[in-house]
Amino acid sequence: MFPNNKMLLIAGPCVIEDNSVFETARRLKEIVAPYSSSVHWIFKSSYDKANRSSLQNYRGPGLKLGLQTLAKIKETFDVEILTDVHSPDEAREAAKVCDIIQVPAFLCRQTDLLVTAGETQAIVNIKKGQFLSPWEMQGPIDKVLSTGNNKIILTERGCSFGYNNLVSDMRSIEVLRRFGFPVIFDGTHSIQLPGALQSQSGGQTEFIPVLTRSAIAAGVHGLFIETHPNPASALSDAASMLSLKDLERLLPSWVQLFTYIQEMDTVSI
């Protein structure tokens, strides 16, 4: 599906807010350009955040306008596109535009959604639910494989640890790798504090550098990073997104570590 020697970087804003998404895509392409031989960039953004903490929170432009926007970004910047879907009907529509359709963590056991996603023959990124052990991902994988589609990505995004907290168990990455599909670490959702701000989730972005480096050292094939020009003003996940400026600062260390790990001799016990 992807070059074996390149780090996957799935990056973009949490949700399409307005036409500023085009400037974000332009900046991302500019940031990644110096590392084109080492990084395979995929643009991500959502047309609808269906699981916002509060009914009053911004959800996005909706399916029709959102997919039109993603199609324009794909054409303008010559980049592959990922977006998340929430129903079988959405999966069918999104697959007409997007290269990768994502099954959200909260929906990762929904049989109809997984089967329909597989039937589109698009690449399917299954995010591991915060409530699942890594070995339980066999079930969601089998549902997609039942359609004859083996183009699967698995994403680790932390697991629930008491109320309003997530932890990242790096053993999970090794377990997921053994399924034989590319494994991605979500460096921004993994530092969320779900519901900690009551009407929205909090976040501890100061832990993004150490967790992303740890995940790369553990053997992930790439990173999932939600990024924004000014996270404080973002309409969704303001507390957990990484600024474009900080992404640009962190990218060299990610690439350097990924290259080093790729060149190491792996020792199994």
UniProtKB/Swiss-Prot annotation:
Gene3D superfamilies: Aldolase class I (3.20.20.70). HAMAP family: KDO8P_synth. Belongs to the KdsA family. InterPro entries: Aldolase_TIM, DAHP1/KDSA, KDO8P_synthase. Its main location: cytoplasm. Pathway: Carbohydrate biosynthesis; 3-deoxy-D-manno-octulosonate biosynthesis; 3-deoxy-D-manno-octulosonate from D-ribulose 5-phosphate: step 2/3; Bacterial outer membrane biogenesis; lipopolysaccharide biosynthesis. PANTHER family: PHOSPHO-2-DEHYDRO-3-DEOXYHEPTONATE ALDOLASE (PTHR21057). NCBIfam families: KDO8P_synth (TIGR01362), PRK05198.1 (NF003543). Keywords: Cytoplasm, Lipopolysaccharide biosynthesis, Transferase. This is 2-dehydro-3-deoxyphosphooctonate aldolase. Its EC number is 2.5.1.55. GO terms for molecular function: 3-deoxy-8-phosphooctulonate synthase activity. One of its GO terms (biological process) is keto-3-deoxy-D-manno-octulosonic acid biosynthetic process. It is an enzyme of class 2 (transferase). It is found in: Cytoplasm. GO terms for cellular component: cytoplasm. It catalyses: D-arabinose 5-phosphate + phosphoenolpyruvate + H2O = 3-deoxy-alpha-D-manno-2-octulosonate-8-phosphate + phosphate.
